[in-house]
Regions:
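A contiguous loop/helix-start segment that scaffolds small-molecule binding in enzyme catalytic cores
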Residues: 2, 6-9, 87-88, 166-238
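Conserved helicase motor
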Residues: 65-72, 147-151
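Alpha-helix capping/helix-boundary segments
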Residues: 44-46, 96, 126, 180
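Class I SAM-dependent methyltransferase SAM-binding "motif I" and its flanking Rossmann-like core
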Residues: 9, 106-164
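Short active-site oxyanion
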Residues: 32-38, 115-119, 171-172
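Glycine-rich, flexible N-terminal cofactor/catalytic loop recognition
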Residues: 1-67
């Protein structure tokens, strides 16, 4: 590997609006202090995060590359040109760890193809923290992203994941758009078998954090308001 190349730092961010230094190690602060080029999903929120970590850092001097659903795949290799010229780049997620349920994975793959060193930094991952605290199988689990919006398709997918969990003894993880969270927990309680375990991990790392695992039947009786709150759902059928 060419040691004169810059490195691609994978920089975790907070999962909410709490103090970054409550959940991020000092190394993250140091890397941000020493980096002026960033690949981000949203420039406004990324700049706000950088300012909270390093208030003294000059914002006008930052170079920002946008990586979101509007970014052309053909543009991605050029984002890493500074690394080829010996300059480090930071890859930021909107929340949590870059490359995990995050478009940053495409840039990381290109970095490997170009023999650019990839350096993951320590930080919160809502997916891992949810499975850690669920009491479910942390040896075998799968993240399934978003479930279908259509009522019939969603019901079929919930039943399919329940079957997979039972057949493979595998925890099934998924998410929902926050304003549909309450509908999701209602659907899980009504569609799953009564003894299937359901974990709701909401507002992870925040002062309003709520994490609870109980059966689908118990969720019918114990209501919780998840509206517009970042939530991870996990099911496991024994």
């Amino acid at each position: 590997m060419n040691t004169t190349k810059g490195q691609l730092y994978l920089i975790p961010t907070t999962l909410g609006d709490n103090d970054p230094m409550e959940v991020l190690p000092m190394l993250v602060k140091k890397v941000i202090e020493d980096t002026d080029i960033f690949i981000v999903e949203n420039e406004k929120t990324a700049r706000r995060f950088i300012k909270r970590i390093t208030p003294e850092k000059s914002q006008p001097s930052l170079k920002i590359f946008l990586l979101n659903k509007f970014t052309e795949a053909s543009d991605l290799p050029s984002f890493l040109n500074p690394c080829l010229n010996g300059t480090n780049i930071g890859l930021l997620s909107e929340a949590g760890c870059p490359g995990v349920a995050d478009p940053g994975a495409d840039v990381v793959k290109i970095a490997h193809d170009k023999n650019i060193k990839v350096v993951p930094l320590v930080g919160p991952s809502s997916i891992l923290m949810a499975i850690m605290s669920s009491g479910m199988n942390g040896q075998s689990f799968a993240f399934n992203g978003y479930l279908p919006i259509d009522k019939g398709e969603r019901k079929s997918e919930i039943k399919r994941l329940e079957r997979l969990s039972f057949e493979h003894n595998q925890s099934q993880i998924f998410i929902e758009t926050p304003y549909r969270n309450n509908k999701m927990i209602e659907d899980l309680a009504s569609v799953l078998e009564n003894n299937t375990d359901v974990c709701v991990a909401c507002d992870i790392t925040l002062s309003t954090e709520f994490i609870k695992t109980q059966t689908a039947n118990a969720w019918k009786k114990n209501k919780v308001d998840l509206h517009k709150r970042p939530t991870i759902f996990i099911i496991h059928k024994s």
